[in-house]
């Protein structure tokens, strides 16, 4: 795809988790810590088994959350309850269901705390954000949980670079719903054809921008597999590629 810029923009919208902030890295560390801290070897043959049960179910829940099929509270709880109930050693665990539910609640709470503590910027994120902020009003558009997102923003040291922050819970709708993008447009006083959205998730960031009639830059993080059914206005392998476009 030709990444030559063909029009000018008045504002830039950008996703946060795994576009600017390294949520995947923070989550990996958090899951490792929790496996040891809460003796999850009682439920699983290995840490790898725990992660193998957690990851696909978590992705499934986030997909349902994006479609308003489950609540935030259900997502937070069930992404840990499900693995606990399906661990290969569950039959040997001598405890009541209420104990497993309580553990899932504890894991859910600690996961949010740990991923926030382990927050870091992705490679090239600070350079990109400061570069873009000199040229455009920047707006974060995120589905992340409000109780931790602002703390991550503060830890980033980039607060002064953003004109607006649009969070799913504060707006009452989420990506890929066009309404969250329309709220960002309203706050910036621009129309859909005057902005571009940057994000790593095709299902929420790119499809959402398409739904709102907004151009997109899809950050694919050097994924080698082809996805011919998924298109974007521009596609880049990393954050440095965005500066070549904008």
Where are each of the predicted segments found?
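Asp-based, Mg2+/Mn2+-dependent phosphohydrolase catalytic module
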Residues: 1-12, 130, 139-141, 145-246
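Residues in soluble alpha-helical coiled-coils and helical-bundle/repeat scaffolds
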Residues: 21-25, 116, 120, 193
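Active-site neighborhood of HAD-like aspartate-dependent phosphohydrolases
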Residues: 2-53
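Short, acidic loop-to-helix structural element flanking the phosphoryl-transfer center
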Residues: 74, 100-101, 105, 109-140
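A metal-dependent, Asp-based hydrolase signature
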Residues: 56-110
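Hydrophobic alpha-helical core bundles mediating ligand binding, dimerization, or RNAP-core interactions
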Residues: 27-35, 54-58, 80, 108-115, ...
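Short helix-capping segments at alpha-helix termini
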Residues: 39-43, 87-91, 157-161, 189-190
């Amino acid at each position: 795809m030709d990444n030559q810029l063909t029009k000018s923009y008045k504002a830039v919208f950008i996703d946060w988790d795994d576009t600017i902030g390294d949520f995947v890295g923070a989550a990996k560390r958090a899951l490792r810590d929790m496996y040891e801290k809460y003796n999850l070897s009682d439920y699983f043959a290995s840490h790898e088994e725990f992660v193998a049960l957690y990851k696909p179910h978590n992705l499934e829940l986030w997909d349902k959350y994006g479609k308003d099929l489950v609540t935030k509270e259900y997502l937070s709880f069930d992404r840990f309850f499900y693995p606990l109930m399906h661990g290969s050693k569950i039959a040997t665990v001598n405890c009541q269901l209420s104990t497993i539910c309580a553990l899932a609640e504890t894991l859910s709470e600690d996961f949010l705390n740990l991923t926030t503590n382990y927050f870091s910027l992705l490679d090239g994120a600070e350079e990109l954000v400061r570069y873009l902020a000199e040229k455009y009003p920047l707006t974060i558009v995120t589905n992340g949980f409000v109780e931790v997102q602002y703390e991550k923003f503060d830890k980033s040291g980039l607060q002064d670079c953003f004109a607006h922050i649009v969070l799913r819970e504060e707006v009452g709708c989420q990506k890929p719903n066009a309404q969250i993008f329309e709220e960002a447009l309203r706050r910036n006083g621009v129309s859909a054809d005057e902005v571009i959205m940057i994000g790593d998730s095709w299902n929420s960031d790119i499809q959402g921008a398409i739904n709102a009639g907004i151009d997109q830059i899809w950050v694919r993080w050097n994924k080698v597999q082809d996805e011919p059914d998924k298109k974007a206005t521009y596609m880049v392998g990393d954050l440095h590629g965005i500066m070549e476009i904008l």
